[in-house]
Amino acid sequence: MIDNKVSVCSVGKVVITEVATFASHPLYIDRKTALTMIRSTRAASRLRLGARYYASHAPYGVLSEHLKRTPRTNSQHYYPPPQGAHDLPKVSSMGDSIASIVRGRELWVQEKDKSDKPEKSDKPDKTDKTDKDKPEKQDKDKTDKPEKTKVSHTPSSTASTGAGEAAAPPSAPPSGSGSSSSSGGGSPPAKKKKSPAQTYPEILAVPISDRPLLPGFHRALVIRDPNVMKAIDEMITRGEPYLACFFLKEFSNADVIQDASEVHDIGVIAEIQIQSQDHKRSTVDASNEPVYVLILYPHKRVRLNSLKNPPSSGGAVSYASVSEDVAEDGELLLTSKDLEGYSEEFLEAREEAKKAKSGKTEDSKHDSKVTSKDGKETTEKYDSSTLQESPYSFLSTYDVSTAAISLIEDKPHDKNNRVITTLTNEILNVFKMLRAEDATLREQLSSVVGDILRTEPAVLQEPGRLADFAAALCAGEGKEIQAVLTALDLETRLNRALILLKREHTNAKLQQKIARDVENKLNSKHKKFLLTEQMKAIKKELGVDDGKEKLVEKFNERAEKLDMPENIQKVFEEEMTRLQSMEPSSSEYSVTRNYLDWITQIPWNKTTEDRFNLPQAKDVLDSEHYGMKEVKDRILEFIAVSRMKGGLTGKILLLQGPPGVGKTSIGKSIAKALNRQFYRFSVGGTNDASEVKGHRRTYVGAIPGRLVQALKQTQTENPLILIDEIDKLSSSRTQGDPGAALLEALDPEQNNAFLDHYLDVPIDLSKVLFVCTSNDLSTIPWPLLDRMEVIEMSGYVPDEKLNIANQYLVPQSKKETGLENVNVQVTDDAINALNRQYCRESGVRNLKKHIEKIFRKVVVKIVGEYGQDEVAAEKIIDVEPVEKDKESAEKKTTKSKSKEVNEEPAAKEEKDKATESAESSETKVGTKAPPVTVPEDYSLTIDEKDLYDYVNSPPYSSDRMFEDPPPGVVMGLAYSPLGGSALYIECILDGGLSADSSARLSSTGNLGNVMKESTNIAYSFAKSFMIRNFPANRFFERAGIHLHCPAGAISKDGPSAGCAVVTGLLSLALNHPIDSSISMTGEISLTGKVMKIGGLREKAVGAHSAGAKTIIIPKDNSGDWDELPDTVKEGLTPVFAGTYQDVYDVVFQGLDTKVAAEVWKKQFDLIDRKLDKRGSK
């Protein structure tokens, strides 16, 4: 650390000595630069020991000819200047001045001609002798004309004397220090002197805002008020450079005191020793206003008796209130914490002093009393009328504040007081500790403390000055320093100064510790840097360059751009240390390098800004997808909730629906609506858990899982990740279960610390929006399904498919086939025919294929008609030379790659030429054909009748198998991944009714177990229904029934065909055909209850496609029917059935019950006769 110390030489120069660790040299600057430096000390709010700048200088007359003082001739001077002010003494060098300054003295140096020496301070003053011998004459002179005397101009003297009185010599102790009360044993009595006057004329009063002045210690002061500047100029011109300084109670930048209550009543009288004259160099504020920078030397403590306001404020006189010195014994300032570290001697002395003072009271307003020469305290009242004309009377012409002040002295004390002695020793001990702790103060304090220790008896006689020095050294608050200035009781002053000094010592220790830690850290980094540079130099000399340095530099650059969490940063630093300590040939080198490459590409704490605009999100979803109301509403709800909460959180959504309905594409639209990055990966057929959670680093070619790869690719922590085909996961005994691995990632309570096997550090996935797709929920593991919010996506109805084709599929297909600007139209009838006869699936993927096929046929037709004449003749290209050139270029490139990373310029140039030759050779291979020009009047319309020419014959002719169905045939409804369709139930009598036949039911049609059980339940219910309603009809006693569901290649399962099976069996038993326009669905119970089914939307679409007019559905599905779009319900009459009786009433209207009861009577009569014959035999 560099400590700058400023001193003024006798020739008007300023010397700055820089004390550094390795060198020390002086710099000489001019006066203006010195004032600029002094001004900068104002920003530090004080000039004190230990600051960066400390100035000691001669009186103002040395630096400027303008400031030279002339001998006074005014006989009415009431306050004579100090002795030596006319003689312009010189200041010593820096080495000798520091110790003198901190003790509050100036060291006067002899002139160049050694002959002019100052008189010794121990000689008696002739003025004193004259005054003693002629007291009466002196009293007379007081009335007529004050006697001009010279006062020693040394800070150690009591710089305030009365009219016609001489001050003590420089070597005498200050008044109030205890020397006046004790004469010392055996010494001759001192000559009597007149006691100094205690009341002074009205002089300029200046407020101090940041830190009070202490007697004996220089201080810089900035004056901004122009009136105060002018007053100071005249004061300097008149040779009266003295002013009173008082500390403000509240901070203010004013230079005028408006009322005595604004300042503390105890301040100092100070002498102006340096005044700046260059306004430009003295400007310190942003307004560029001229200011004065004054260097003040405070002499003595004074009390403010009264204050005269500026003339602009009325010139009223306000009187200062006497401050009470609270806690004179220091109890309020000295806490139990402050007592830590005190010596036992001090604590014992302190307790004895407290006991001695117990029960006694003192007048708290002792500051208003003065001490006479005989040691008695008297109260002196200020009366301006008794004073003679003041040399400062000219100040009344300026708009400044003036004050009447009184000199105050320290309270008498016993020099054998143990508490004062112990406090003095404690302060000296703290000085020693400060010298050891603070390097800035070490040089100054070494000389000061050493001198104090050598002259300890003298210090004990001046404890007040020691307390002021300690307070000036400390960086306490202004009120704390003012408390030291106010304390006239030496014990209290020492106590308060000691507390401030101990706080300064604590701060010094803390600063030293911080500096030590910083230095150690810097040294460690510097050492590491030097070793690294040396290693680079050694490798360069040996010709070994493995590229490790560039790799390390690349990783460090990446890491600086990332906001890594603390734990990730620690792992990164450890792996970097490992990488630097490895050799490139090591097997672990590539593993660590790949790991660092991954960990520095993860977007730690980096997110994209979400979009909370509901109308804009709705427009994005509607522009890219038709329908899907439930999905769009859920996304808008998600955005609205996030807007209400103030931020988006991670969600796990599952879109379940048939293929081709847009589950994957809606995921992209959701990401676009939310302004998030999109990443998709399919887990269909995945049977390795490492695909989700990554591989261990020990395996060759190990990489992180797909979730970490998604973060790397999207470069954000809040993307939308689409996990496609999650219902097609599989498991393996050896490679784990990927479905179980997804449990951690898809659990909102756990994914904030997802642990990938490769990275092996927690990763926050809580901000990711997961969207999964599935065709069948039954194959998803239940724990995984429980973590997701399921949104069902139904298949499209014909009207929706028509709109999707016109708005999306047809324009997209025309653009892909080059017909974007050609007038080719596909009519709505053609698209409806495609949906009805070619593409019955719930999705539109197959419809898109057929539309693309149509436009491809159109393109072939157009190119064949208009494109043959425009095709340019193809040139025959010899491919072999091209391949040879390419091979040679590749060989050159391979050779250049085998060299070191740092190639020579010539090698790089060859490589570039080889690459250019290879590229130029490759460009000769392909040719670009000109586009076909189609006439503007060309037009083509594709109608339903033209479909055969483009997409061949339809695979489906009609959904209705029977226009007039026979008895036993009924139209049911089925739902499959392809959508809804009509499912006919056919029942026939197998083998007729005979005596040898028996009741039985057989079923075919690739039925599943659930549907087989449903047919058995329906058969049992049908028999019971016939017994209850048609007891005479004995059909089910002997009938062998065969039940079949057409389209045997398609597997069928589910309980929803129960009502249709019962109806088919009853239709056969009653020999009554069912209307072909009636379709039905519903599960039947054994007692005839019609139960709720699923897939009502698709089944309604199937009924509509089959031409049904009436649809019978369970009563519990009435709410689902109301939610269906009107385009689906149009043309269908719903019938809600609670029991099968409701179904029977609709499908068997107009049935003749008598005929139905006897429809099989003839057959059963024959059977009975045969059985009777067999019985009679």
Swiss-Prot record:
GO molecular function: ATP binding; ATP hydrolysis activity; ATP-dependent peptidase activity; sequence-specific DNA binding; serine-type endopeptidase activity; single-stranded DNA binding
Chain residue ranges for the region called Disordered: 72-197, 353-386, 883-932
Positions annotated as active site in the UniProt record: S1056, K1099
Location of the Lon N-terminal domain: 203-505
Boundaries of every Lon proteolytic domain copy: 964-1150
Record key words, sorted: ATP-binding, DNA-binding, Hydrolase, Mitochondrion, Nucleotide-binding, Protease, Serine protease
GO BP annotation list: cellular response to oxidative stress; chaperone-mediated protein complex assembly; mitochondrion organization; oxidation-dependent protein catabolic process; protein quality control for misfolded or incompletely synthesized proteins
Superkingdom in the source lineage: Eukaryota
Gene3D superfamilies: 1.10.8.60, 1.20.5.5270, 1.20.58.1480, 3.30.230.10, LON domain-like, P-loop containing nucleotide triphosphate hydrolases
Class of the enzyme per the UniProt entry, highest EC level: hydrolase
Subunit details: Homohexamer or homoheptamer. Organized in a ring with a central cavity.
Record-given protein name: Lon protease homolog, mitochondrial
Source organism of the structure: Yarrowia lipolytica (strain CLIB 122 / E 150)
Top-level taxonomy: Eukaryota, Fungi, Dikarya, Ascomycota, Saccharomycotina
